[in-house]
Each structure stands twice: as structure tokens, then as C-alpha cells.
UniProtKB/Swiss-Prot annotation:
Source species of the chain: Homo sapiens
Ranges where the record places region 8 X 4 AA repeats of C-C-X-P: 62-230
Keywords: Keratin, Repeat
Protein name: Keratin-associated protein 5-5
Membership in a protein family: Belongs to the KRTAP type 5 family.
Quaternary structure annotation from Swiss-Prot or TrEMBL: Interacts with hair keratins.
Gene designation per UniProt: KRTAP5-5
Function recorded in the entry: In the hair cortex, hair keratin intermediate filaments are embedded in an interfilamentous matrix, consisting of hair keratin-associated protein (KRTAP), which are essential for the formation of a rigid and resistant hair shaft through their extensive disulfide bond cross-linking with abundant cysteine residues of hair keratins. The matrix proteins include the high-sulfur and high-glycine-tyrosine keratins.
Amino acid sequence: MGCCGCSGGCGSGCGGRGSGCGGCGSGCGGCGSGCGGCGSGCGGCGGCGSGCAGCGGCGSGCCVPVCCCKPMCCCVPACSCSSCGKGGCGSCGGSKRGCVSCGVSKGACGSCGGSKGGCGSCGGSKGGCGSCGGSKGGCGSCGGSKGGCGSYGCSQSSCCKPCCCSSGCGSSCCQSSCCKPYCCQSSCCKPYCCQSSCCKPCSCFSGCGSSCCQSSCYKPCCCQSSCCVPVCCQCKI
């Protein structure tokens, strides 16, 4: 029986494909390219799970665009960035997690500029760090926190480099459009203040704004002891 499930070649019993099936020989390890399925480089249609639809749902595996069962992509056990193709995992810095998070479709890692070394160089631009995830080797330059800078914030000086800079502030200072939560960094801006969108509501006395942070309690964001008690205010993550 051939890999199209046809006995004696590809007749009308081959899902209606007829002779255009290209013979569907078992030597291709799956469906022959003439079947409209996997080519011989794919390693067989058995590698094309329905969970791979859209080339971005492979879980711990990696979607490789060059070996697809149309309209789905094949998942491979580990992320081999060299096989992910231009604009895909290859521009994520080469880590397994980086590739998995970015997927292989245009607009993922490509939106970071596709520069070597990961998405950290995107500087927090739209569709940047948040899209790539945030583990060492992928978006590690974004701080390495789970979810990436875009999702979990950049309140530490090591979190977002390069980062947006507001006028009069040091190069490592995050601007509101750069990182979330919108926090100034202790190395470049004073006071150590978080904007209202940085902290969750606190149990503060009336008259204290949520943008008020205490320098000694910068991580997580806290209300200043001079205006509120209790002092704690968790950062939004």
C-alpha cells in the first residue's frame, strides 16, 4: 500500500487525487509532494499534527516551514534554528524557547528587526519583546523574566536594553511607550516613581496617588511611607 493509502498506486481510491498524486511511493516516508501533502524532506506526514495549524502552535516543538503538510506545518522535537528559515526562528538568537515563542510566520521575530542575538535589540517596539517571550538566549537581553518585557515590565535597569529614553533622562531610562509597567529606572531617573498604570490599587489613605513610589521599596512598586500606610503596592504583572 502506498503512502496515500492506495493499493497499486494512486487510483481513484486515493482520496480523489487520481494520477496527479505522483505515485505516492512509500519511499517518500509519507505523502509524496504530488499528493498536496508532505514532500520527502518532511520525514512523513506523521510529523504534521493538527496542533501545528498556522505554524505557531507546536508547543515544545518547532514548526519548520520548509516541511509542511499543507496547510499545516510539521513539528520537530527541538528547535533547530538553522532549519527554520529566513524570518523565522533563525532571527531569534538560536535558543529553543526563542524559536518556539516566535513561531515561523512573518511578523513575529521579524518585527524585532531580525537582528542577531535575539529580540532585545528591538527596544520595546510594538510586536517586539512581548512576541518573543523572555528566556535566556531568546529575549534574554530583555531581562529574562517570564513572558518578556512587553508582558511583565521593565522596572530594572537590566530589563530593557536598548530602551526608549525620555528627554533629560539617562540612556537606560524607560519611557512610558517602551516598557510596561511604566517605571523609571533608579540609575537614571528620580524620584523612583511608577506611573498610575504600573501599580495595582493599594490600601492607602485618601490623598495618596497610585503613582507614588518609595525608593527603598522599588521592587515591587510601593506607596511612599511619607504619604501612605501601609506601604506595599504590587507591580502589575
